[in-house]
Amino acid sequence: MKKLVYVILTMQMNFYKMSIKQRGFCWRVPVLIFLICGYAPPAAAQKANTTDSNAIYLADPTIFQYKKNYYLYGTSGHNANEGFIVYTSTNLKSWEKSTAGNNGYALRKGDVFGTAGFWAPQVFQYHNKFYMAYVANENIAIAESSSPLGPFVQNVKAPLAAPVKQIDPFIFIDTDGKKYLYHVRLTNGNKIFVAEMTDDFLAIKEETLRECITATEGWENTANAEWPVTEGPAVLKHKNLYYLFYTANDFRNPDYATGYAVSSTPYGPWKKFSGNPIVSKRNMGINGTGHGDFVQGKHKELFYVFHTHYSDSAVAPRRTAIVNMGFLKSRNSGADTLRVQPGTFHYLKPKN
């Protein structure tokens, strides 16, 4: 390779001494060298370190920022039938399990709807209250609290009404104040839907319900399952476009991976990114990468928090990981591209 670089530099230095015919050949040589030697598909990531037992075991994680603190919630890797514990951090690196309230639980069974299967929480603030959208008994419910630490409770212990089972809520409040519930409905597969919500977050406006994402591409159903899965929606708005993150395949599948789609409206139609998946076992170095949420750092940097399998040979308990992300500016009038930075991948750890 050093010799090839030397040849190119020598040709460039003598460029203006050459004839027109020689100059034409000079331009072709670097291109040929690049085509022969310079192109290779992106290298696979190094294997993630799964030998460290000092880890946080939360699946379907979400991080909520309030003032100077970050709050981490997720589906428990040990007992998902009691509610949701919460970890806190000031720097997204060192995490401490909360001792406030119900033994560290931000939401606990008995205070809200649900007896089992407490999955996929999302916490957000609206006016002076904090809300947690979550799953229990394969239904979506929303609880409220005066603090991100909880306790999150319901005055009326009930789920959102729906004719089918539904999971994985993500509430997005648009810049015009309208509220949308992105969620998964279990109907001939796990499919992502959206509907506008009422201002009190107690119901959806049924007439606005739209299907957003189903498994239509090869990477989204690598097992050719009869019940294809797209789940774990998370939405952000960038330059007046909506970016919908989603994860495909059964969560037990090593190919569980994350991609995104873009739309000019909250309802779609959604155009899937041609480079999907952008978070996968290939670039993260571990199986089962997905179902996460976005969080912004204190310097406006963007992160994606998600879970992975425990190891290459075991699914559970799933580990909580995070990776940096950013937008690559479009060269034309199209959508900016979301890119992950695989070298920043690491697992979240509890404070010693």
Name the predicted role of every residue range:
Residues 1-46:
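Bacterial Sec-dependent N-terminal signal peptides
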Residues 45-352:
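Carbohydrate-active catalytic/glycan-binding domains of CAZyme proteins
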